[in-house]
Design a protein with these regions (language model features):
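Glycine-rich, basic loop-to-helix element that forms the pyrophosphate-binding segment
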Residues: 63-79
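A recurrent flexible, glycine/aromatic-enriched loop bordering the glycosyltransferase active site
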Residues: 120-121, 138-157, 173, 179, ...
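Membrane-embedded multi-pass helical conduit in multi-pass membrane proteins
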Residues: 240-317
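Short, acidic, metal-binding catalytic loop of nucleotide-sugar glycosyltransferases
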Residues: 21-30
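Conserved donor NDP-sugar-binding/catalytic core segment of glycosyltransferases
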Residues: 96-127, 202
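A conserved acidic beta->alpha catalytic loop
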Residues: 37-46, 91
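Short aromatic/hydrophobic "clamp" motif used to bind/position activated sugar donors
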Residues: 84
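Catalytic donor/gating beta->alpha subdomain of glycosyltransferases that bind UDP-sugars
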Residues: 169-229
Length: 326
């Protein structure tokens, strides 16, 4: 089975070596690896070029200001094979990742799309809390194994699927993968799962980086029209808190303190729910979970703030001023 692996990258000098090493050490070697650089200003291109000189099946395509969707489209268009595997920079595949994806096709030759699984990297306390806060809990069981939510960055599909759904949206920095998956579902392609095809996904390392990333996620999720799946609940939650604050304002001079207390209680309740939902994935005693609770509260507040800022950026820049998204 000949497979082309497509990887969109931009300014990934810190992670690209690990990704390339993982792809070059696959037990099922890809027939072709296509790296599409979207305009890196760091050493990413040089690193890929060095490896390409050593491995003839590794190719680098350079684009200018290409977002992930365009990068995947360019890579898929240049692919020499019918089967396309997608993975992202900042992600590290297990050595049998590609073999496990291909095995799903062998078991069902009618398969059009295979989704693998992914695991967040939790090598620091902050990343552990991040995984609990926004790393999705596996909810779908396949062959007695629970898998994570479907992700393009751990997938294998026929070239005809990519053509059939007209590729990825090229104007979005994020959420283009969610739209792509939705189009696949709407088109009725045959989907299989490979829960043992695992990649490891790097979380953001601190609050500031998390805030910046979620502002981008939020803005582009709005551009993609997927706000009901995310922003709606956040806006309702804080809308109700604002209503409570307005009522308290007319009743007592203590309204700021009471409102702050309600805000903290809301965050703590969500943190406790997150800990409970992740109790099997990240088991811990009372002391460890108490520590996690105090890590989760500011993290959830940061994500909520970023979500609202992203919505505001979409409203002002994209709806009112009509500026192109970046």
């Amino acid at each position: 089975m000949n497979i082309t692996v497509v990887v969109p990258v931009r300014n990934e000098e810190q992670s690209i070596r690990l990704l390339l090493q993982g792809l070059l050490e696959q037990t099922l070697a890809p027939a072709e690896i296509v790296i599409v650089d979207g305009g890196s200003t760091d050493a990413t291109r040089r690193i890929v070029e060095e490896q390409a000189r050593k491995h003839s099946h590794l190719h680098l395509i350079c684009e200018t200001d290409a977002l992930p969707g365009k990068g995947r489209n360019v890579g898929a268009a240049s692919a020499a094979n019918e089967w396309l595997a997608f993975i992202d920079a900042g992600v590290s595949p297990a050595n049998d990742w590609l073999a496990q994806l291909a095995e799903a096709v062998r078991l069902n030759s009618q398969t059009d799309v295979v989704y693998g699984s992914w695991e967040p990297v939790t090598d620091t306390f902050f990343k552990e809390c991040a995984a609990i806060a926004y790393g999705y809990v596996p909810t779908e069981e396949v062959d007695a194994t629970f898998i994570q939510s479907r992700a393009v960055f751990s997938s294998l599909l026929r070239r005809s699927v990519w053509l059939g759904v007209k590729g990825f949206s090229e104007e979005l920095r994020s959420a283009e993968d969610l739209l792509f998956i939705k189009r696949i579902d709407d088109a009725g392609f045959i989907v299989s799962y490979a829960p043992k095809a695992v990649v490891r996904w790097s979380m953001q390392p601190n609050l500031w980086r998390t805030f910046r990333r979620f502002v981008t996620y939020s803005r582009h999720n709005m551009l993609a029209g997927l706000w009901k799946q995310w922003q709606a609940s956040v806006l309702i939650r804080y809308g109700l808190l604002a209503v409570c604050a307005a009522i308290l304002f007319g009743l007592t001079s203590w309204w700021p303190i009471i409102t702050l207390g309600l805000f903290i209680l809301m965050l703590m309740a969500r943190a406790i729910v997150a800990l409970w939902r992740n109790r099997r994935r990240y088991p811990a005693g009372v002391l460890r979970n108490s520590t996690r609770l105090f890590g989760l509260v500011p993290l959830l507040a940061t994500i909520d703030a970023a979500t609202i800022v992203g919505v505001a950026a979409w409203l002002v820049s994209d709806k009112l001023l009509g500026r192109p998204s970046v």
